Amino acid sequence: MAMTLLEDWCRGMDVNSQRALLVWGIPVNCDEAEIEETLQAAMPQVHYRVLGRMFWREENAKAALLELTGTVDYAAIPREMPGKGGVWKVVFKPPTSDAEFLERLHLFLAREGWTVQDVARVLGFENSSPAPGPDMPAEMLNYILDNVIKPLIESIWYKKLTLFSGRDIPGPGEETFEPWLEHANEVIEEWQVSDIEKRRRLMESLRGPAADVIRILKTNNPDITTAECLKALEQVFGSVESSRDVQVRFLNTYQNPGEKLSAYVIRLEPLLQKVVEKGAIDKENVNQARLEQVIAGANHSGAIRRQLWLTGAAEGPAPNLFQLLVQIREEEAKEEEAAAEAALLQLGLEGHF
């Protein structure tokens, strides 16, 4: 679970997960200065910077993400460190050695009934090469990985798009346009292949009128990019809301009864991005616009709303989406903890009487 959090957090912040540490088990009431003091005492030889902190609900404690900024001696990084409230745990991903890489490579290919030579032959490498072993130079291992194994895996096993036809009534397995486009943007960003291959995979998901649109465009412009294809589909099949309509919808989206404020922020974000796309809000003002609307729309989170109002009134830039969610989740955790304590106290009083 901790390793998954480390990888997801790093991916969300565009940080190399092998150059990062996750420190968790930090008490909720531990402030920034106390965290920094503990880290410095436990890792005096390690150069790092703290990227962020969050409340980890499953552990009922805070977690901190650190980026390693210098030459790293992984032997100097402790797996645990003494801190406020007990022992803090440390999770990281040291670089894989050549021997470990080879072992994993052979295991993977063996499960599929392949050898490295088989893969090289299929991909057009006619010259036979010796089976890789621990003595093979790292440059050759990297070449095999980048030019043989990764392309094979990516070409055979990749996440496919859902189907879209553009028909008024979607057929079996087909999506309407807005959900399809959102899913397509997410998946296409994950594909580590050329734009030509991305366009081919995009065409795989299209049926009927939608496929006809892209075929016509491709006939007129054989070099059309995947992004241009998506833009064309949006112009043909997307909503025709004006920038004013989108902005009004954004400003009239409020927190629902029983909805956590963090969930409201996540629900609000696609609308905000659409407002930006329509040009109603400048990209430079996105964080401020988000904060103002969250404060205005937080109908059912009074205490957190007051904290956010103080954040907005303070000098300095408004928090970005990630920082805002971290702040809100920490406040939600405090409220839940206070509510649980109040419930226990009430049970105790009822039992006494």
Swiss-Prot record:
Give the matching Pfam families: PNMA, PNMA_N
Q: Which UniProt keywords apply?
A: Nucleus
What subcellular compartments does it reside in?
Answer: Nucleus, Nucleolus
A GO biological process this protein is involved in?
inflammatory response to antigenic stimulus
Q: Does the keyword Kinase apply?
A: no
**Any one cellular component term from GO for this entry?**
nucleolus
The text of the family note is:
Belongs to the PNMA family.
Its recorded name reads Paraneoplastic antigen Ma1 homolog
**Which species expresses this protein natively?**
Bos taurus (Bovine)
